[in-house]
Amino acid sequence: MMKSIRFLASALALCLVDAYLVTPPGTPAPGAASACSAWVQASYGLTCDIIHRFYGMTAAEFEEWVSKCPAAQLYPLNYICTDSAKNPSVSQLGDGCTLISGLYYCVQVNYITQSPTWTPPTTTTRSTSSSAGNGVTTPTPTQTGMVSSCNRFYLVVSGDSCYDIAAAQGISLDNFYTWNPAVGSSCGGLWPDYYVCVGVISDGTTTTTTTTTTPTTTSTTTTTAGNGVTTPTPIQTGMVTNCNKFYQVVSGDGCYDIAAAAGIALNDFYTWNPAVGNTCAGLWPDYYVCVGIIGSSGTTTTKTTTTTTSGNGVATPTPTQSGMVSNCKKFYLVVSGDGCYDIAAAAGIALSDFYAWNPAVGDTCAGLWPNYYVCVGI
């Protein structure tokens, strides 16, 4: 009986040493860094290269986080470092990098500065004086390049968008991007659980917040083109001056959905509203967009079936996006909410093949259009 108790205690002790900054939802890959704060589960079609590009890390970083013993200054008391902890399937990256399906791999590490006495991580956020010496304490973590004159901060949570944060804080979106350059001009670099700047010190003395947002009430003005049509505001820059039909964007809208509901072609929507970009990344809620112009009767999309031009005898359904391979034999109709990885996995093909056969979707899946057919087999 005593031997069983000692064995159980030893087993529990071994489990305790595998502590992580953020506990993975399932079984972690052997040798994952104890300072790991984000995880991804290996599944069919997921490759090391996809992980590198999606999470913005180098192959060397990924190898270190998932297969090497953590540095001594990280968590010296909660991890036993041995060579046997390395995971051969990842440590030998190169062209032969493979992942073990079902295991969780580390994709983010939060480092802690070495100190004489180690203190376990807590749920509270560390604060340090800003490097500018302006007397304002800056909470951490923050992304690189944040303005040194910041005096108001916001902790990003999953699901936030740059527009929503700026609107809630009463600042302009342009100022938000200027103060937080790491998030990028399309908000693609906004990281949950990081602090962003939402207010700055004016003239180095007074604490103020610049407010240039549009009031929630909507006013109307006459278009500068003098076409007699009143244009509601706010609108984004560059909208065509001969617009005679408008739509106010709501949170959750997509460019394709707006165009389809208005009975116009997506290309026309992008042309009439250039500020939204050709991937819809610049679509702003609560702003009006153009969905009809003078002299246009709209475009009705009809679905027909035609034979492929390559003469392979396979009927190709329409519509399809440009550039799809001509020797495709198997098709899938995209529905709203689909992702390239999910489509490829369901069809049993590699994600790289899906991108190669459907170049219009791009290598980040930003160009995937609902209600269009894509190739999932050749």
From Swiss-Prot:
It is found in: Secreted; Secreted, Cell wall; Secreted, Extracellular space, Extracellular matrix. Residues 118-139, 208-230 are annotated as: Disordered. Gene3D superfamilies: LysM domain. Residues 118-131 have a biased composition (Low complexity). Keywords: Cell wall, Chitin-binding, Extracellular matrix, Secreted, Signal, Virulence. Residues 152-198, 245-291, 330-376 form the LysM domain. It comes from the Eukaryota. One of its GO terms (molecular function) is chitin binding. Residues 1-19 form the signal peptide. Belongs to the secreted LysM effector family. The LysM (lysin motif) domains are small globular domains involved in binding chitin in eukaryotes. LcpA contains 3 LysM domains. This is Secreted LysM effector ldpA. It comes from Aspergillus fumigatus (strain ATCC MYA-4609 / CBS 101355 / FGSC A1100 / Af293).
